[in-house]
Amino acid sequence: MEPIILASSSPRRQEILKMLGIPFQVIMPNVNEAIASRIAPNNTTELLAREKIIDVLHTLPSNQKIPWVLSADTIVTKNSKIYGKPKNQEEAERFIKEFQGATHTVITSVALYNGKTRTTTTKTVETKVTFAPMTSEEIKWYIDTGEWHGAAGGYRIQSLASLFISKIEGSQSCVTGLPIYELYDMLKEQGYSVLESFE
């Protein structure tokens, strides 16, 4: 099975590739996310996912054979406002206060570069997440866990935040940052067999 370059530093995305038995190496892209600040949220993630691939391709030696590059980008949005990764504890607390007792949307785009065809394909997934009403003590407790560090929207659905999430409409793996079905479908369309790793 051919190795994939993962253009992401996300531990969760790495865990998903390991679970699927896909060999990969990580190259962290250097993309200015401010370039997407003036476009619609559902276009933001696709643009950034593509930019991450372009950045990684430019860092590789020109004579290096590049079979596959995979990237993804996730944003959280509510009432047309985008919630990125909180800069500090106060911002993380504000995010959770705005999410509690309400529904927001998580958008993840996956981009896959095929080195044989030199083309990039993308898929975008949206999932609605509803937080139950939370007390100030619950919000403080969650923020004090530190899970908000490095997480879009300031929470991790696959961990302790799940205590307060009452409803998910759509793909849970979209919320964790790499929609598994869409990834599998893209790889299959491009002739990359994930199933080989289990034979």
Regions found by a protein language model. Give the residues of each.
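Cofactor-binding loop segments of dinucleotide-utilizing enzymes, especially the Rossmann-like FAD-
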Residues: 9, 29, 115
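Short glycine-rich, Thr/Ser-proximal phosphate-binding strand/loop in the N-terminal lobe
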Residues: 21-38, 120-126
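Anionic-ligand binding patches
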Residues: 2-5, 40-199
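N-terminal beta1-alpha1 ligand-phosphate binding loop
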Residues: 2-22
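A short local structural element in Rossmann-fold oxidoreductases
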Residues: 18, 36, 140
